Amino acid sequence: LISETAEMCPNSPYAASKVAADRICYSYFRSFGLDVTIVRPFNVYGERQKSGLYGALIPILVGKALRGESLTVFGAGEATRDFSHVSDIVRGYNLVLNSDKLKGKAINFASGVNTSIKDIAEYIAKKFHVSVIHTPARPGEVMRFPADISFARSLGYSPRVGIWEGIDRYIEWAKSNRY
């Protein structure tokens, strides 16, 4: 599990940019005493999220499925992620805003459950009767990215929306918004 104190070893420029932002925020706390809390939401998805060239996995897959296209999975799809519904992340941010115990600390917000990319693609494909195709794995792909949310739980955080319910909510939103 990836805790708030785990060493950060980014495998891609995108991941490195996130680590850099994290460390810049922390440096303002250390250097100037700013009231900074570093919030680390894991793989957020949900209603109103757009797909597109740089979109997130679930909106991209649902968008393709709505158009009747095959869903593309890189590699075997065995990589797992800790997907977090936006409503759970909003509750996490509210926790941070209303806590006086987090100055200078990092906190993970996630579901606490890892789901494979393949399982998500197959779930969406089945709902829309489209196929899943596999292409070569992307360079630098992280195979597992499980969040340790025990610190957040100790402060009262409790994710409520499971991955399948969250995907269903997103699908309904996408359909009703002609997305």
What residues fall within each predicted segment?
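C-terminal substrate-binding subdomain of Rossmann-fold SDR/epimerase-dehydratase oxidoreductases
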Residues: G63-Y179
